[in-house]
Amino acid sequence: MMNAVPISWFLTLSAILFALGVAGFLFRRNIITVFMSIELMLNAVNLSFVTFSYQHKEVAGHLFTFFVMVVAAAEAAVGLAIILTVFKNRSTLNIDDVNSMKN
């Protein structure tokens, strides 16, 4: 199936997804949006790993992507727990309001 679509298209899609993630990380002020942007960047890198792995007929990229997804799932659980705790304590998810150390 991937032989019908050039490899450059997958890498271009990966670059676009990564750029959207960076833009969301840099320009958004909501913690959940920033968190989702980081996850989008991770998935863009995973797409690149799988693309190169398929092109070179090796399994290493697929295995590495699997482990990255496992770690990302654990990171998502911990990150959402932290976000929930911050929201309970501060009643806001704006990064500028959460950054201040005073209560």
Curated annotation (Swiss-Prot):
Membrane-spanning ranges: 7-27, 31-51, 63-83
Enzyme Commission number(s): 7.1.1.-
Record localization: Cell inner membrane
Annotated GO MF terms: NADH:ubiquinone reductase (non-electrogenic) activity; quinone binding
Source taxon at top rank: Bacteria
Keywords assigned by UniProt, alphabetized: Cell inner membrane, Cell membrane, Membrane, NAD, Quinone, Translocase, Transmembrane, Transmembrane helix, Transport, Ubiquinone
Single GO BP term: ATP synthesis coupled electron transport
Substrates-to-products reaction catalysed: a quinone + NADH + 5 H(+)(in) = a quinol + NAD(+) + 4 H(+)(out)
Membrane topology: Multi-pass membrane protein
GO cellular component entries: NADH dehydrogenase complex; plasma membrane
InterPro entries reported for this sequence: NADH_UbQ_OxRdtase_chain4L/K, NUOK/Mnh_C1-like
Leader sequence residues: none
Family note: Belongs to the complex I subunit 4L family.
Matches recorded under HAMAP family: NDH1_NuoK
Function comment: NDH-1 shuttles electrons from NADH, via FMN and iron-sulfur (Fe-S) centers, to quinones in the respiratory chain. The immediate electron acceptor for the enzyme in this species is believed to be ubiquinone. Couples the redox reaction to proton translocation (for every two electrons transferred, four hydrogen ions are translocated across the cytoplasmic membrane), and thus conserves the redox energy in a proton gradient.
UniProt subunit comment: NDH-1 is composed of 14 different subunits. Subunits NuoA, H, J, K, L, M, N constitute the membrane sector of the complex.
Protein's name in the database: NADH-quinone oxidoreductase subunit K 1
Protein source organism: Solibacter usitatus (strain Ellin6076)
Organism phylogeny: Bacteria, Pseudomonadati, Acidobacteriota, Terriglobia, Bryobacterales
